[in-house]
Amino acid sequence: MKVKKYDQFNESVYQAKLANGLTVTMLPKTGYHKTYATLTTNYGSIDNTFVPAGSTELQRFPDGIAHFLEHKMFEKADHDAFQIFGQYGASANAFTSFTKTSYLLSATRHLKENLTTLLDFVQDPYFSTATVEKEKGIIGQEIEMYDDDPSWRLYFGMIGNLYPNHPLQYDIAGTTDSIAKITADDLYAAYRTFYHPENMTLFVVGNFDPDEVLALVKANQDAKDFTAFQPIERKIPETAADGHDIIPYRTIDMPVNRAKSIVGVKGLVPIESGAAALKYRAAVNVLLELLFGDTSADYLRLYDQGIIDDTFGYDFELQNGFNFVTFSGETDDPAQFDTAIIDVLENWRRSVVDQDDALALVKKEMIGRVVFMANSLEAVANRYDQRLFGTATIFDEPAVIDSLTLDDLTAVAEQLLQSQAISEYQIRPQAKN
């Protein structure tokens, strides 16, 4: 078992890779009553074309299958995993993102029983035609609910602009038509391909002894038989390096009282995983704070002019294989909103060049936020992404942020904020009859 010490935080992270390939990462934290765990597979909504385990041919699976599989994992032939967690006083949940699926556990007692339940229910799938058909109705209602959500439509409308030929454009849950095609055999094929321990990580943080937890997990895994791991072959379409495939502008009408607008910027340069990805994320976040933080000159100017208001916000998405930034808000004049945001992006140098004092202040604020998040077990676990950031944890982030210079931000801005990578998407109020 490897140990990585963070003396400045008085924390130690323990990691081991088991014989079956499962990576176990543990962060014991004394003084906490709760323990939080995530069991994650590197399988998300964009992984809809792959070679199923045991096969040699690429196969296209219905959109939404990763999310559908996540929903069905809790249900077994004669019980529901939630019932067992409830018996041991634990809460459980799961989520599917573009690139991964995670199963979450939170408990203040019975850690042995709850960790065992987490491992066992995820590693023992049960799908039948009847239960799959029943789930289609449940997920279909969820999809329809999101289809009626203007904020959701705005966000995925922008993704569709930035990635029109990429599975990113599809809702993580799929569509009612796509999930109607999912079969139990499809779920088993996806499960066998992506839910092998070699493609999964277990992260445990909270009040426990790492030697005891590792022994528990090892014994649990040694008692199970797994087929040999077949390296995963995915087919993810390439996107244009010069951004020529980006849709520059779209608008739709919806029953909203006030227009919504979003400006997006697609990262055109691939980002290497590991330390480079961690630094890139930190640099982009600092850059965005300099440009649009609520004390920045441009933010205050646009706010005073009434171009943006308290509904304004920005988001940076960095996952394995893609990254993009969005700026959105409600507005009475979508064209004016978009023009103002794009002006700030294209004239980023006025917020970066010679702004040493502003940089120092933003870095201090961001380090403070990270240190604060490090006290949250959920934040520590959910920010861990071995596939993207390697062995780095939240405790590596302050040093990375502190090391950033204006030259670093200039390099990132020149790389990311390219005019040909910008797109606009608007939702306007429907005309009243």
Which residues make up each language-model segment?
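Charge-rich, well-structured scaffold segments of protease-associated domains
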Residues: 17, 80-234, 274, 279, ...
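His/Glu-rich zincin catalytic helix
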Residues: 1-80, 188-191, 195-301, 412, ...
